[in-house]
A protein has these predicted regions:
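SAM-dependent methyltransferase catalytic region
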Residues: 1-155
Length: 155
């Protein structure tokens, strides 16, 4: 996908309007505990450029405040097909508020640990993990065996 200068500007502007919320009340130690280092616009744009289109379901399993999902929507993704999982309840609330302005239903954004398979129970039955047919957008540190969703039970 080619990301136009106009879209780059929109992504940067949208990011900057929420940046003050991202670290609100969180010390560096707390952010390190949850792995909270949010994706800057430059990296988000590079990730968008890797996609041919954004017509499918998009899951960000470490969505934070929703910056990557917001950028996908600004680039044309269907907000109702955008999903996120976040470990920190405070950050998840910021994400829900941020993405509701872009049309993402709050029930598409879930509290949970993406490394455990139990957090995926919230998603509609039509949601697929078929990596041959769906593009899976992973933002953050992925488990060693990315598609073994129950791997953490056997550590």
């Amino acid at each position: 996908m080619i990301v136009s200068d106009t879209l780059k500007s929109q992504i940067e502007s949208e990011f900057n309007s929420w940046i003050e919320h991202q670290y609100a009340g969180k010390s560096l130690k707390e952010r390190q505990e949850f792995g909270q280092f949010f994706t800057p616009p430059e990296l988000t744009i590079q990730m968008l450029e890797k996609f041919d289109n954004l017509n499918g379901t998009i899951l960000d399993p470490t969505c934070g405040c929703g910056g990557l999902l917001a950028a996908c929507i600004l680039a044309g993704a269907d907000p109702k097909k955008c999903y996120g999982i976040e470990l920190d309840p405070d950050i998840l609330e910021i994400c829900r508020e941020r993405l509701s302005h872009l049309g993402v239903p709050k029930y598409n954004l879930h509290l949970g640990n993406a490394l455990n398979d139990d957090c995926y129970d919230h998603f509609d039955e039509s949601y697929s993990y078929d990596v041959k047919n769906d593009k899976v957008l992973i933002n953050g540190k992925a488990p060693k065996q990315i598609f073994d969703f129950g791997y953490s039970k056997y550590r």
